[in-house]
Regions:
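Acidic, small-residue rich beta-repeat scaffolds with periodic aromatic anchors
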Residues: 16-98, 198-285
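Acidic/hydrophobic-patterned starts of short beta strands in beta-sheet-rich repeat architectures
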Residues: 97-105, 148-159, 199-203
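Short, solvent-exposed loop/turn segments at conserved positions within beta-propeller repeat blades
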Residues: 109-113, 164-169, 209-212
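Beta-propeller blade repeat segments, especially FG-GAP/WD-type strand-to-loop junctions
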Residues: 118-122, 166-185, 216-221
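Repeated scaffold domains used in trafficking and secretory/extracellular systems
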Residues: 137-143, 187-194, 237-239
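Calcium-coordinating acidic loop motifs
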Residues: 146-148, 282
Length: 285
């Protein structure tokens, strides 16, 4: 009887005196679960990327076996992985993208993640120029054009991220690949519209309508200079606009008030998104 009372007393003390300990234990357990999930996610991503790299090696062998000095396209399914791992689709496109040199663009995709690589084919030697990995249902595509008006073709990977609140057409722009040795680096642009004859880029930033900016950049060789930003004027609830050189640094001395958007912005892709606001969108500003 005495032992039962003592045991009950210990249990009561434990319940009354350890809410902080219980909270800490709960937090530790929660952190452990999160960490385990992150480890599984990281491990799965690494496995997926390694499998895509294996498929890329197979694609290079296909090119070595089948490319005979002329434009060539080929699409096939790589071997299926274990369990429920999906087929990997391989898309190969070999062309003279730049002058007289053949390049190969290869996509390896498991329908969730995509690995993209660009190779220069020089006397049967495959030189890797770029390699980009796109996770989580991001579907990239490529385009070739003169972005900065220097009469030299540029290469771009375009994609729309699978997460985020607002319009976000992303360009990875690789300037003048034919003029550069080794791996290429890119300039990242969001919602751009290119005006190569003017050596300009006009576009829309990232954010909600009414709070997102228009921008204008000028090419200086392969560098970009910021010329101006335009934002809806909060004071007039978007009926007029403010123009300045600094996005968040407008001052009364430097800002220019506009009663309407300049005509030069009317051809910006997605302009309707920039203008898709009402007076209510400024009520909390």
């Amino acid at each position: 009887m005495r032992y039962s009372c003592f045991l009950s007393f210990l249990m009561l003390i434990g319940c009354l005196s350890s809410p902080k300990q219980q909270e800490e234990s709960s937090q530790i357990a929660s952190d452990t679960v999160v960490e385990a999930k992150e480890q599984r996610y990281f491990s799965k991503n690494v496995k997926n990327e390694l499998l895509l790299q294996k498929a890329m090696v197979d694609a290079l062998q296909k090119i070595a076996d089948s490319f005979h000095g002329e434009d060539w396209e080929y699409t096939y399914d790589f071997e299926k992985g274990e369990g429920d791992t999906p087929h990997i689709r391989i898309d190969i496109n070999v062309q003279k993208y730049f002058k007289e040199t053949y390049y190969a663009v290869i996509y390896a995709s498991d329908y969730v993640n995509t690995l993209v690589r660009l190779y220069r084919i020089d006397h049967d030697v495959m030189q890797e120029k770029l390699s980009e990995y796109f996770p989580w249902m991001t579907v990239p595509s490529d385009t070739i054009f003169d972005a900065n008006g220097d009469k030299v073709k540029d290469f771009a990977l375009t994609f729309y991220p699978s997460s985020g609140c607002c319009r976000r057409d992303i360009y990875y722009l690789y300037l003048s690949p034919e003029k550069k040795e080794g791996q290429l680096s890119y300039i990242e642009l969001i919602n751009p519209t290119f005006y190569p004859k003017e050596h300009l880029i006009r576009g829309i930033g990232y954010g909600w309508p009414g709070h997102v900016e228009l921008y204008k950049y000028r090419w200086r060789g392969e560098e970009l200079d910021t010329l101006e930003y335009i934002l809806p004027d909060v004071a007039t609830k978007g009926k007029t606009f403010l123009k300045g050189r600094n996005l968040y640094g407008f001052t009364k001395e430097k800002e220019i008030r506009l009663t309407k958007l300049p005509e030069e912005y009317q051809t910006v892709i997605g302009l309707e998104y920039f203008l898709d606001y009402t007076e209510e969108d400024f009520n909390n500003d």
